């Protein structure tokens, strides 16, 4: 724990008394011992029976509290590359020359895993203490970043910069920009490709593992909106009863997998995740085309049913995100006596923007088809 987070560290130590090893990267304080001193006290020789461990990440908690993901140990020799490192090297061209930029919080599984993986492969990691759009461009230029990982919100914030600001920075060192974790609208992806060129890759996966798709820039341009094809095993799209659906129909996305894990101290959730067939069910809805490319509709838990019509919030969010008055947006379903559910958009406006009925009307009219028009508005 960094000394700069001393107050938070002490609160965590008090709240979780079962923590046995408490280390700080600076001078010792409270119950936290110096990491340097602890390392210096260890034998210089490696233990004779040391084997490789496994990451234990936590789920994102979209349907409740984050859950620990406990993987079986392989017993392989220490420093044997784990699957994430092998995949980064084979699929995303990471090696000992990579300079990886990670602006997202390390309590998320992907930024932490990819940062560790880069170092295991001999590369360099640049971690920031927050995201700022222009600072990101300055960092890429300063550190000659080769690989970076973003979420679509980062893309939007960078695209909102004036073109003159974006043009100030030399981004030519970028070999690969990867994004995941949330839906990226077609318009945003097209603008990023126009700006940075064919270096943008997308993947779809989940903290639990058991399913992973990848799509490169050329593939995506040919099938706009896809998150790619599986590299781990067959994908199935099924209805609520578990029946396989034809290509092109929206249903629950499931992956055939031999990979196993346990939710920490939660066998019931573990059984629910794999279901009776033993397939991974990440909780997303989507469809596949005739070539096996997966397209996502939304989280199953996010779908809004209004007057018998299925409405996917991410479609409305993708449109509203591009409006120049909006900084961020979330679209949700709210109870409605007539339709069962109505659509509600909660928007964060750009600084200096006036929230009034004129703007609300403008946003409702902004590139929507009737079934997607949000009917309630909250304006902070």
Predicted regions span which residues?
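ANL superfamily adenylate-forming
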Residues: 10-57, 76-85, 161-164
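Conserved AMP-binding/adenylation subdomain of ANL enzymes
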Residues: 77-99, 103, 107-147, 161
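Adenylate-forming
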Residues: 67-70, 79-90, 100, 137-139, ...
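Conserved adenylate-forming
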Residues: 42-52, 56-101, 123, 168
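Gly/Ser/Thr-rich phosphate-binding loop
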Residues: 36-37, 55-57, 61, 120-121, ...
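Short beta-strand->loop structural element characteristic of the AMP-binding/adenylate-forming
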Residues: 1-7, 67-70, 124-130, 201
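Beta-strand->loop->alpha-helix junctions that form or flank phosphate-binding loops
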Residues: 23-29, 201-208, 227-228, 332-335
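AMP-binding/adenylate-forming catalytic core of the ANL superfamily
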Residues: 1-3, 138-140, 148, 241-244, ...
């Amino acid at each position: 724990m960094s000394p700069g987070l001393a107050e938070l560290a002490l609160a965590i130590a008090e709240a979780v008394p079962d923590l046995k090893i408490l280390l700080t990267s600076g001078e010792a304080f409270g119950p936290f011992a110096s990491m340097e001193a602890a390392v210096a006290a260890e034998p210089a020789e490696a233990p004779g029976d040391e084997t490789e461990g496994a990451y234990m990440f936590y789920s994102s908690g979209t349907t409740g509290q984050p859950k620990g993901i406990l993987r079986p140990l392989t017993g392989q020799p220490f420093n044997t590359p784990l699957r994430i490192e092998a995949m980064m090297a084979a699929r995303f061209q990471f090696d000992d020359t990579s300079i990886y930029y990670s602006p997202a919080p390390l309590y998320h599984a992907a930024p932490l895993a990819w940062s560790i993986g880069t170092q295991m492969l001999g590369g360099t990691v640049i971690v920031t203490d927050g995201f700022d759009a222009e600072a990101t461009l300055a960092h890429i230029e300063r550190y000659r970043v080769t690989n970076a990982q973003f979420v679509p919100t980062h893309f939007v914030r960078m695209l909102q910069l004036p073109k003159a600001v974006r043009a100030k920075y030399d981004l030519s060192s970028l070999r690969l920009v990867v994004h995941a974790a949330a839906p990226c609208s077609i318009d945003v992806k097209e603008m990023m490709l126009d700006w940075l060129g064919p270096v943008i890759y997308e993947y779809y996966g989940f903290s639990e593992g058991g399913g992973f798709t990848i799509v490169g820039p050329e593939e995506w341009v040919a099938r706009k909106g896809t998150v790619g094809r599986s590299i781990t095993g067959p994908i199935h799209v099924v209805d609520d009863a578990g029946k396989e659906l034809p290509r092109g129909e929206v249903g629950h996305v499931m992956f055939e997998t031999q990979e196993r894990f346990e939710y920490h101290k939660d066998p019931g959730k573990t059984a629910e995740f794999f279901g009776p067939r033993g397939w991974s069910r990440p909780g997303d809805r989507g469809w596949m085309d005739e070539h096996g490319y997966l397209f996502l509709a939304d989280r199953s838990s996010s779908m809004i049913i209004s007057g018998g019509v299925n409405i996917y919030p991410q479609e409305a969010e993708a449109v509203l995100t591009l409006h120049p008055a909006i900084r961020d947006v979330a679209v949700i379903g709210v109870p409605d006596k007539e339709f069962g559910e109505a659509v509600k958009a909660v928007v964060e406006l750009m600084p200096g923007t006036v929230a009034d009925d004129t703007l609300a009307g403008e946003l409702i009219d902004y590139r929507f088809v009737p079934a997607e028009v949000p009917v309630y508005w909250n304006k902070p």
